[in-house]
C-alpha cells in the first residue's frame, strides 16, 4: 500500500473527527493524550520488529481494542447524517485492515514470518500518517511534509509565529537547493565530458566473454543497408580535348570514360609496359563505336595529355580546398558511413570493412601480372548477391534496378558478393577486423598454433625419419615440410598457367631457384634460394641445412633441367593432406604463425633489459618484430620520402645536441657560482640546470633510437607479421610486464582488432 494513500485516508478521518471535537472539548484532550500513548506504543513496536510473528499479533489485538474504544466515544455524540459518513469510513478501514492481515497470513503460509513493518500496517486510527523512514513515496513536495501528521489544534499566536518561521526557513532551503542543483548540474556535465570515452568503452561488445555459437553457425540475425555503388561517370568539360594522330576527336561517353582511366595513369610506370598497353587497347576498343574503331587503330597515335593535365589540376584543386569545403566533404562521408558502414548482427552494431563497391578502372595486379591493363567493369546491382537473415529488412536496390539474388546463409560471414570480370574471382563485403567474427577467427588461428606447440617435436622427429625413406615421394614431402618449418615458406596453391604472375612457393620450387654449396662463408651444406615470392617480392636467402637434407636435394636435382620442378612427386594437395593427418587443422600457414609467434616471444626475452627506459624497450620490441618479418620474408621497397625524412630527423638530432651542449655549459657555470656564493638560491639554480640537462639527454636518446629504428626497418614491413602472424597476447603480456603503454606498439585500428587480447591477457601469458 502506498504512503500517499495511507496519508490521505488518515487526513480525511482526522478532519471528520475535528468537527466533533468542537462539541466535545473535554474528549478532545483525552484523545490527544491517547494519541501520544499510541505513538509511544508504535515506536516500541518498531524497536521490537525483530521479534516473532506472535508478538506482532498481540500488538495488533491491543491496537484494535483501542480503536473500538475510540469509535464508541465518538459515535454517541454524532448526528444521523454523520453516521452514514462514518460507516463509509469504517468500510474503508476494514478493507485496509483486511489487506494487511492477508499479507501477514500469506507470509505465514510461505513458511516464514517477517518482522512487522509500519509500511504493511493498516492505518486504522486515522489520526496520523506513517513515519517518513518507513514509507517512501515517489515524490514529495517538500521536506516538512515528511514529518508525522498531528491533529489540528485551535490556532494561537505562538502557532502562527512558528508557522511563519517555518515558511521562512523553507524559502531559504529552497534557495539553497536551487543553488546546489545548479552546481550538481554543472558538475554532472563536466563529469559526463570526462566519462564519455569510458562510456564508449563500456558499450564495446565483449564477445569473448560469451558462449560460442555451435560449429559452423556464424550469426543468428543479420541486417544491413547493402553496398554503396561508384558514382556515375561525369563527361569531361568541352575544353578538354582528346587527340588522335594530331587531330581533335570527340569520343563517345563509354570510350571517353575508359580513356580517362589510362590518362589518370599516364605518368605511371605501368603505362610504359607492353603487356599493360596491349591489354588496355584491346579492352578499350570493345567500348568504342564502329566509327571510333575504324579511326583509332594504334595506341601510340593517341594523345591523352590534356586529359591527364585536367586530372592533375583537379587533384591540385582538392589539395587547395578551404577548411569549410574539406569539412563539408568530411561530413558527407561520415553521413554515408553512418548509414551504410554498419550492420546489426545478433543485436549488436558492427562496423563493415568495405561497404563501397570498387569503381571501374584498369587492372594492375601484383608483380608482372599477365592481365595488367585489362578493364575492370562497372559493378551494377544486377551483379550483386545480398546475404541477410530471413527476418531482416532486405536492403533496397537503387531505383530502376534489382539484386541478382538475396540469400539467408548464416554459415558464411559475408554481407554482399559479386564476381569480378578479370579473373572470375568472387569479391565480398565483409565485417571490419574489430568485429566478433574476425576476432573469433584470429583467436582460433592462434589457439591452433598453440596446439602445434604441443606436438611440433613429434612432427619434426617424423619428417627427419622420412628423409631416409625408400619412397621418393615421402622424401620430397619430408624435405618440403622441413623448409616450411625452418624457413616459414608458403606451401603454395595450384595455378593456371598464364592466369597469374609467375610467383613461387615451396611446392613449386624449380631447379633454377636453388644453388647447393657444400661449403660457403665458413659454413657447411649451404642452400642458396633465389625466387620471386608472393606479390613478386624476391626471396633471397643463404641457409645452412642438415647434411641429410643437402644430400636429398642433390638427389632431387639429378638429371633435371633448370626449369624442371625440384619436388616433381609433390603438390600442395598431397602436402596439405599429410599436414591434416599430422594434426587436425594443421596447414603451412599454421606453421608460419607458430614459428613467427614463438620467435617473437624468444626474441623479446633475449632483447628486453629490465633497466631500460620505454623508448629503448620499444626499440627492442621492433628488433624482435623485425626478426619475425625477416623469417617470413615481409619486405618492402624503401619509402620514396625515406632520405628526406632521415635528413629532417638528423637535423633535429644535431639541433638537440647543440641544446644539450649549451645546457651542460650553463650547469657548469651554475656549479661554479654555487661554490662561491654558497646560498640556497644558487643551489636551486644548479638543481634546475641539472633537470634541464637530464630532460635534453632523454630527448636526444629518443631521437637517436628513432633514427636507428627507421634505418633498420627501411626495407622490412613490420605491420604484416604484427597483424597476421604474431599472437597479440605475447605483445600485450610484454607491455604489461615492462610498463610499456600498449599505444606505443599498437595504433588505434590495431587496438580495436586485438581488443579481445588486450582485455583477457595477463603479464605472465606464455604462447
UniProtKB/Swiss-Prot annotation:
PROSITE patterns from the xrefs? TOPO_IB_1, TOPO_IB_2
Q: What is its EC number?
A: 5.6.2.1
Which residues does this entry mark as bearing N-acetylserine? 2
Localization per Swiss-Prot or TrEMBL: Nucleus, Nucleolus; Nucleus, Nucleoplasm
Q: Looking at its record, which EC class is this enzyme?
A: isomerase
UniProt-reported outcome of changing residue 505 to G:
In CPT-resistant cell
Binding partners and assembly: Monomer. Interacts with ERCC6. Interacts with TPRN; TPRN interacts with a number of DNA damage response proteins, is recruited to sites of DNA damage and may play a role in DNA damage repair.
Name of the protein described by the UniProt record: DNA topoisomerase 1
Amino acid at each position: 500500500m502506498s504512503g500517499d494513500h495511507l496519508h490521505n485516508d488518515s487526513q480525511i478521518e482526522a478532519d471528520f473527527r475535528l468537527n466533533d471535537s468542537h462539541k466535545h472539548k473535554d474528549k478532545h484532550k483525552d484523545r490527544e493524550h491517547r494519541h501520544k500513548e499510541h505513538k509511544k506504543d508504535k515506536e516500541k513496536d518498531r524497536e521490537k520488529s525483530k521479534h516473532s510473528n506472535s508478538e506482532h499479533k498481540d500488538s495488533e489485538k491491543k491496537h484494535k481494542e483501542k480503536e473500538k474504544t475510540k469509535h464508541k466515544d465518538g459515535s454517541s455524540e454524532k448526528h444521523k447524517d454523520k453516521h452514514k459518513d462514518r460507516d463509509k469510513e469504517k468500510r474503508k478501514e476494514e478493507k485496509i485492515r483486511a489487506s494487511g492481515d492477508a499479507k501477514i497470513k500469506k507470509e505465514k503460509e510461505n513458511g516464514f514470518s517477517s518482522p512487522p513493518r509500519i509500511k504493511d500496517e493498516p492505518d486504522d486510527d486515522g489520526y496520523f500518517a506513517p513515519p517518513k523512514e518507513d514509507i517512501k513515496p515517489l515524490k514529495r513536495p517538500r521536506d516538512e511534509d515528511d514529518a508525522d501528521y498531528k491533529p489540528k489544534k485551535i490556532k494561537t499566536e505562538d502557532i502562527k509565529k512558528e508557522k511563519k518561521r517555518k515558511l521562512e526557513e523553507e524559502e531559504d532551503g529552497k534557495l539553497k537547493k536551487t543553488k546546489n542543483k545548479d552546481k550538481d548540474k554543472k558538475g554532472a556535465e563536466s563529469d559526463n565530458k570526462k566519462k564519455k570515452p569510458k562510456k564508449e568503452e563500456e558499450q564495446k561488445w565483449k564477445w569473448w566473454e560469451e558462449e560460442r555459437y555451435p560449429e559452423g553457425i556464424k550469426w543468428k540475425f543479420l541486417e544491413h543497408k547493402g553496398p554503396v555503388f561508384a558514382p556515375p561517370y561525369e563527361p569531361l568539360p568541352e575544353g578538354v580535348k582528346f587527340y588522335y594522330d594530331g587531330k581533335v576527336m570527340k569520343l563517345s561517353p563509354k570510350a571517353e570514360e575508359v580513356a580517362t582511366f589510362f590518362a589518370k595513369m599516364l605518368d605511371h610506370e605501368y603505362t610504359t609496359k607492353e603487356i599493360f598497353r596491349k591489354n588496355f587497347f584491346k579492352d578499350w576498343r570493345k567500348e568504342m563505336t564502329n566509327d571510333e574503331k575504324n579511326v583509332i587503330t594504334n595506341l601510340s597515335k593517341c594523345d591523352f595529355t590534356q586529359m591527364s593535365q585536367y586530372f592533375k589540376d583537379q587533384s591540385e584543386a582538392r589539395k587547395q580546398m578551404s577548411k569549410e569545403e574539406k569539412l563539408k566533404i568530411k561530413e558527407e562521408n561520415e553521413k554515408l558511413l553512418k548509414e551504410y558502414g554498419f550492420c546489426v548482427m545478433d543485436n549488436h552494431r558492427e562496423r563493415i570493412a568495405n561497404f563501397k563497391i570498387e569503381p571501374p578502372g584498369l587492372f594492375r595486379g601484383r608483380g608482372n601480372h599477365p592481365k595488367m591493363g585489362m578493364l575492370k567493369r562497372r559493378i551494377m546491382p544486377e551483379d550483386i548477391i545480398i546475404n541477410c537473415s530471413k527476418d531482416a529488412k532486405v536492403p533496397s536496390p537503387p531505383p530502376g534496378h534489382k539484386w541478382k539474388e538475396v540469400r539467408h546463409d548464416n554459415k558464411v560471414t559475408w554481407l554482399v558478393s559479386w564476381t569480378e570480370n578479370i579473373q572470375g574471382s568472387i569479391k565480398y563485403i565483409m565485417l571490419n577486423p574489430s568485429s566478433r567474427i574476425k576476432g573469433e577467427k584470429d583467436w582460433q588461428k592462434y589457439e591452433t598454433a598453440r596446439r602445434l606447440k604441443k606436438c611440433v617435436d613429434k612432427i619434426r622427429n617424423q619428417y627427419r625419419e622420412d628423409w631416409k625413406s625408400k619412397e621418393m615421394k615421402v622424401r620430397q614431402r619430408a624435405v618440403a615440410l622441413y623448409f616450411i618449418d625452418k624457413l616459414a615458406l608458403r606451401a603454395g596453391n595450384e595455378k593456371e598457367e598464364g592466369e597469374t604472375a609467375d610467383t613461387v612457393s615451396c611446392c613449386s620450387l624449380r631447379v633454377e631457384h636453388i644453388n647447393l654449396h657444400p661449403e660457403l662463408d665458413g659454413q657447411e651444406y649451404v642452400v642458396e634460394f633465389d625466387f620471386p615470392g608472393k606479390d613478386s617480392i624476391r626471396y633471397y636467402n643463404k641457409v645452412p641445412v642438415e647434411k641429410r637434407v643437402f644430400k636429398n636435394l642433390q638427389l632431387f636435382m639429378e638429371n633435371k633441367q633448370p626449369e624442371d620442378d625440384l619436388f616433381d612427386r609433390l603438390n600442395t594437395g598431397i602436402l596439405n593432406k599429410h599436414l591434416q593427418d599430422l594434426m587436425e587443422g594443421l596447414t603451412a600457414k599454421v606453421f608460419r604463425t607458430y614459428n613467427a609467434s614463438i620467435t617473437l616471444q624468444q626474441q623479446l626475452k633475449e632483447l628486453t633489459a629490465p633497466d631500460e627506459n620505454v623508448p629503448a624497450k620499444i626499440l627492442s620490441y621492433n628488433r624482435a618484430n623485425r626478426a619475425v618479418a625477416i623469417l617470413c620474408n615481409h619486405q618492402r621497397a624503401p619509402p620514396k620520402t625515406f632520405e628526406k625524412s632521415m635528413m629532417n630527423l638528423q637535423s633535429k638530432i644535431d639541433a638537440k645536441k647543440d641544446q644539450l651542449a649549451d645546457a651542460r655549459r650553463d650547469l657548469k657555470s651554475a656549479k661554479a657560482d654555487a661554490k662561491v656564493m654558497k646560498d640556497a638560491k644558487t643551489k636551486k639554480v644548479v638543481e634546475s640546470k641539472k633537470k634541464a640537462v637530464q630532460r635534453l639527454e632523454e630527448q636526444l636518446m629518443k631521437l637517436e633510437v628513432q633514427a636507428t629504428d627507421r634505418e633498420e626497418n627501411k626495407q622490412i614491413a613490420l605491420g604484416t607479421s604484427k597483424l597476421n602472424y604474431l599472437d597479440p597476447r605475447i605483445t600485450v603480456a610484454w607491455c604489461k610486464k615492462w610498463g610499456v603503454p600498449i599505444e606505443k606498439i599498437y595504433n588505434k585500428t590495431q587496438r580495436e582488432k586485438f581488443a579481445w587480447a588486450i582485455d583477457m591477457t595477463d603479464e605472465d601469458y606464455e604462447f
